[in-house]
Amino acid sequence: MARIAGINIPPQKHAEIGLTAIYGIGRTTAQKICDSCGIARDKKIKDLTDGDLEKIREEVGRMTIEGDLRRETTINIKRLMDLGCYRGFRHRRGLPMRGQRTRTNARTRKGPRKSAAALKK
């Protein structure tokens, strides 16, 4: 089993798909990594040589991924909340911040509905 950036990559998957198991790497980035390393996108992870895996590790090592990316995202959201700007306020209240309607919908951000009886107490 290949291990890249502390993540076990599923060996039966294609290189392009397997790389998306790493937080911060999607399909497009995975394609760019495969192309820059000279690896066929449809080659299975288990068929990659140690040299290929080392090239991928080197390429992935230059990117902000996993814990660092999560930390950076959290810091950015905290900065918005500390600034007191509109987006920070919406984050703090748990509401959508990109202009979506909230009278109906927005259930993902707002969570499950609260019954009228629960609000009266």
From Swiss-Prot:
Q: Which domain of life is it from?
A: Bacteria
Has the keyword rRNA-binding been applied to this entry?
yes
Which GO BP terms, alphabetically? Answer: translation
Family matches, as InterPro entries: Rbsml_uS13_C, Ribosomal_uS13, Ribosomal_uS13-like_H2TH, Ribosomal_uS13_bac-type, Ribosomal_uS13_CS
Alphabetically list the UniProt keywords.
Ribonucleoprotein, Ribosomal protein, RNA-binding, rRNA-binding, tRNA-binding
Enumerate the SUPFAM superfamilies for this protein.
S13-like H2TH domain
**One matching Pfam family, short form?**
Ribosomal_S13
Which is a Gene Ontology cellular component entry for this protein? small ribosomal subunit
Q: Where is this region: Disordered?
A: 93-121
* Function of the protein: Located at the top of the head of the 30S subunit, it contacts several helices of the 16S rRNA. In the 70S ribosome it contacts the 23S rRNA (bridge B1a) and protein L5 of the 50S subunit (bridge B1b), connecting the 2 subunits; these bridges are implicated in subunit movement. Contacts the tRNAs in the A and P-sites.
**Family label:** Belongs to the universal ribosomal protein uS13 family.
Q: Which protein, by its recorded name, is this?
A: Small ribosomal subunit protein uS13
Source organism (scientific name): Methylibium petroleiphilum (strain ATCC BAA-1232 / LMG 22953 / PM1)
| Gene from which this protein is expressed | rpsM
